[in-house]
Amino acid sequence: MKNTTNTKRTKFIFVTGGVLSSLGKGLAAASIGALLESRGLSITFQKLDPYINVDPGTMNPFQHGEVYVTDDGAETDLDMGHYERFTNAVMGQKNNFTSGRIYHTVINKERRGEYLGGTVQVIPHITDEIKKSVRQLDGSVDIAIIEIGGTVGDIEGLPFIEAIRQLRGDLGRDYTLFIHLTLVPYIKTAGEVKTKPTQHSVRELRADGIQPDILVCRTEVPLEENIKAKIALFCDVQQDAVINCVDVDSIYKLPIALHAEGLDSKILELLNIWTANPNIKPWQDLVENIQNPKNEVTIAITGKYVDLTEAYKSLHEALIHGGLANHTKVKLRYVSAEDLESGDPDSYLKGCDGILVPGGFGRRGVEGKIKAITYARENRIPFFGICLGMQLAVVEFARNMAGMSEAHSTELEPNSPDPVIYLTKEWFDYRTNKIQRRDENSDLGGTLRLGAYPCVLQQESHAGDAYGTQEVFERHRHRFEFNNDYRQQLIEKGLVISGTSPDGDLVEIVEIEDHPWFVGCQFHPEFKSKPMQAHPLFRDFISAAVANKKG
């Protein structure tokens, strides 16, 4: 009898960080995934975040940065974006867990009596739930790369460190690998690097029961072999397991840099895996493209969170990808929408080859964004509006082209006499084949139209030309929609509806007639763009910007 049991066992790489935060664990993990994938291995990722929020969906972008949305509607950490951009892995609900989500699950189990009246504790109940979350990935791929958020030594991260310590015992050394990312600072006045922070970070990790197998040392300058030998001696790792990660001027150079240091080879050696030689030529070609652009354009991003560009991380990268597809260097000019409200648009936007208004929530800076849209429309500058940016493009058009001077969104002006954008209280969910319902009293968290939905395109439109197909799936994160009561009236004034839901009820893409390139989309195309495969709308937006610059 044929055995149909899936016997594949996944090997796990755990990535921790020390010394300080924002060292780039997510990019390091993504680069490791890219290198392993280039050797023919199947990979996936998981991010374990120590904060108590259930997910980042309701967190302030100034504190957390971007909320990255997956196809299945998960609101996740921005590192999910790095994972998807660098590899073919598809992220979802099972790829991002927070302390809040773990504790929520455990408390619900306790309320249901699943612990049979026992005392619920961090060990074993919380750590067991963390391990269960990690082991969901077992058997699905060759390698799962698990990033532990925060910094070793943080009190809130201790349950996760303890859980992965236990997992080594549960799974065995052949199936687990610990990589620790640290900082080796360069003291310019002394002209030397200092290894002590790395030594102390590893000591902290070892005190929690974990001996790292590989150290990835972030530095400003290359490490000499004697420095690597010193780190290896004091941290009890092999010298060729001390990987120098020198700062690079483009994140897309990182896989090549880590490969040159032998990181992927060392990982395979320690996990006892044999593979084909890596194919890193696509990354080399990408870097060649980055370093030798044929054109240069300036794109203005008129937004609310311009003081923290991490809030627009995927947007930033997608514009770079659009540039790469056109062999063009993209310079970004972040313009505060609040400043624009009281300022002259010409002083902020003059000289820009394209204008983009991104998504966001709340009324702060809204009139500044509308002024930017008017400037793009009147001056025939390529314009791209995303989510709220698309909604405000409709508002601007209704006000200035259709005679509705008080047109607005009910999110921003509930008593508007012409609510061209309004709260959608029900819609058809094509993933579940059910009607979804929301109202003004619904919780903020997890109640938006989230995840991938189909969009049917109108041919002979900018969107139709960009995609070159009839139907696409794009990711959403919003509550408010185009009000169909105004559809015909706006179409008669020159608004083009070039994308809708399959039933035609939900407006997904709008354009305007007689403009070189003016597109607004209700979804977030930036979440599906990759450096080697730019999203079609970003590709064509940058192409239009290049044409605009050339006149």
UniProtKB/Swiss-Prot annotation:
Mg(2+) binds at residues 79, 147. It catalyses: UTP + L-glutamine + ATP + H2O = CTP + L-glutamate + ADP + phosphate + 2 H(+); L-glutamine + H2O = L-glutamate + NH4(+); UTP + NH4(+) + ATP = CTP + ADP + phosphate + 2 H(+). InterPro entries: Class_I_gatase-like (IPR029062), CTP_synthase (IPR004468), CTP_synthase_N (IPR017456), GATASE (IPR017926), GATase1_CTP_Synthase (IPR033828), P-loop_NTPase (IPR027417). The keyword Ribonucleoprotein does not apply. CTP binds at residues 21, 154-156, 194-199, 230. CTPSs have evolved a hybrid strategy for distinguishing between UTP and CTP. The overlapping regions of the product feedback inhibitory and substrate sites recognize a common feature in both compounds, the triphosphate moiety. To differentiate isosteric substrate and product pyrimidine rings, an additional pocket far from the expected kinase/ligase catalytic site, specifically recognizes the cytosine and ribose portions of the product inhibitor. This is CTP synthase. It comes from Desulfotalea psychrophila (strain LSv54 / DSM 12343). The lineage of its organism: Bacteria, Pseudomonadati, Thermodesulfobacteriota, Desulfobulbia, Desulfobulbales.
